[in-house]
Amino acid sequence: MKFATIILLAGLMAARGAEVTARPTAEFLDSIGVDTTFPDRGQPLEKTIEMIRYGGFRWVRGGIEGLTEHGPTTLRTYLELHERTGVKFSWGLVSGGTDLEKLLGTARELAEAGALLAFEGNNEPNNWGVKYKGEDGGGRAKSWLAVAKLQRDLYAAVKGDAVLRKYPVWSISENGAEVDNVGLQFLTIPTGAGTLMPEGTRFADCANVHNYIYHPASPHPMDNKTWNAAEPGPACKVDGLYGNYGRTWGRHFAGYSESELASLPKVTTETGCTIDGEVTEEMQGLNLLSMYLDQFKRGWNHTSVYLLRDRTDEGGNQSFGFFDRDYTPRKAALYLHNLTTILGKGEGGREGAAEELNYTIDGETGTVHDLLLENSAGVFQLIVWDERLTGKDEVTVKLNGKKDSVVVYDPTAGVKAVWAGEWASEIGLTLSNHPVVVEIGALR
């Protein structure tokens, strides 16, 4: 990436831009999560800790599957991971689980340690059915009523617990596959929905989606690939929010309207892509970097990528990981490490009210996106990224008045600044397929 001339002339008229309210840098960093293997599947805790620290992940998708009193994966495994990295956990029933007593009991210990983030319903009941109170649901069963009743009871149990009620409950994943209209396409079933479960049934506080970047309906790299995967409406070409909460992809049951989906609380507990065919290691690295940014920009509260490290206990194409099976970091790990390191500078200081910055981006095309953050040291961090498959865009960031310090970073190049200047009012950037971070007001 090259940088065009930085305009420093004192006599330039200030650009008339738009006042944009910055979001806390910590809020974006806290959204960055990952799915991982634990000792019960052959991944030592020490190695997991090293990889979590390197990537800068803030939360991990966890749950009671594979969790036993005597190990190799115990609750102490999770607590130690939290103590040594600071990560929090979404805590779920995972695949086919129904033990609410175990879920809540272990969650109380996580909450006491400050390690609990949220609760999660069943993982993909279309693939892993449940048997709840003698009733089969999901999988090959003819109904999803058992899945719905379990999720209803999970929600009620959490909200009825004096310790746990403050934690959000995330819905099941792949509710778009329901074979009968039990109502899981809603967080709370509205009046007149015509579902099998009654109106007013509460399932969750937050929608949960597995919007993998590549899908049979969108199998190839393209411009705005991850921006589209994060799309909340029907324009999404992958297994996104609309197909699970707008109109279900399986039997086309009606859910929320497009306007309601735009503001629906939502998380992703699985996304990602394998290295295969057109998707090279470089492409995977760029996709995962922009996916975290796109998700946050488009209103997703938390995003977990599958997978931290390639599986060693499964067959097939095991190349989802940020790390290879021998723990070698791929470019995805390197690029994320660089981004979280760049943004993490100055964190841990004061927490103040959100501030505004007046700026415009001239030359911004449909593949160029931006996100304004402010760290706890009061430094603005403007992330500008492009999602072109080929070619470049020349853009100019115009600030309303000259700023005493501007520093530019490229996370695909490293953690050191690629340009720094004083009293700048315009910053020219040549963008292509990855983000740059423009620090404004940084103390150097």
Regions found by a protein language model. Name each.
Residues 272-364:
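Aromatic/acidic polysaccharide-binding cleft in carbohydrate-active enzymes
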Residues 358-404, 411:
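Carbohydrate-binding surface patches
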